Amino acid sequence: ISKVFDQFDIPYEAKVISAHRTPDEMYDYAKKAKGRGIQYIIAGAGGAAHLPGMIASSTEIPVLGVPIPTKHLEGNDSLLSIVQMPKGVPVATFAIGEAGAINSALFVISMISTHNEDVEKKLVKYREKQKKKVLEMKLDS
């Protein structure tokens, strides 16, 4: 996630918080995030994966949940935990693992691009690079 934001010159804050092991810190973080100028929160969680939902219940800031692969259920437990939010407490849920993490950052960048022309130009350039890379691929005969 940080590499993606760095590519687009998007400032970010990274922090390790656990919904189960540091609940007071989690609530404090969520409640004070808006006051620090944070506009979006990406929360990765594995297993019971309560972090994204608990953060979403404590702030009006959009929360994006990324399921982290787990040893026993390969992240399916995390995915189901994050995606099954009750109505009224939304969490945008992404794919399990690295693809979900990268896409969550790109989703934030896409939202920022709607009101930031510089970010929009970088996003268009990024997607053009992706397109070019695919078009240049060769299949082995």
What are these regions (language model features)?
Residues 2-3, 7, 26-31, 74-88:
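Active-site-proximal loop->helix
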Residues 29-67, 71:
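Glycine-rich phosphate-binding loop
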Residues 16-18, 45, 66-69, 93-95:
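Short beta->alpha connector loops at strand-helix junctions that form conserved
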Residues 8-11, 36-39, 59-63, 86-91:
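Short coil/turn connectors at secondary-structure junctions
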Residues 1-21:
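Glycine-rich phosphate/diphosphate-binding loop of Rossmann-like nucleotide-binding domains
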Residues 23-24, 45-54, 73-76, 101-104:
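Short glycine/serine/threonine-rich phosphate/pyrophosphate-binding segments
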Residues 6, 34-37, 105-112:
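Generic helix-packing signal
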Residues 13, 76-141:
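C-terminal binding/interaction regions
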